[in-house]
């Protein structure tokens, strides 16, 4: 399976739940995350960064160092997804976290 299939699946699943998914281009900044994920406007919370890998591949040491640096600065970094199942788990987790934040701030359900 190609990385592009995992990437498309992530984008489709998140956008179907109201998230905005942006591809990042960071010239001169090796090791940056692939995607920026913005929550729906009515759900408060930080954006997330996520790395997409081919199945079975892991982030390079430079990428891990970059992720750790960003986390130390308070950035919400999701390590990486490398399969359709990992995408599904990540989307479910993001949706649940966003829904919980919505409930805490409004006291209302969707």
Could you tell me what each predicted segment is?
Residues 14, 70-71:
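A generic structural signal for well-ordered alpha-helical segments
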Residues 76-110:
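Basic, glycine-rich
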Residues 1-26:
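Acidic-basic catalytic patches of nuclease active cores, encompassing PD-(D/E)XK
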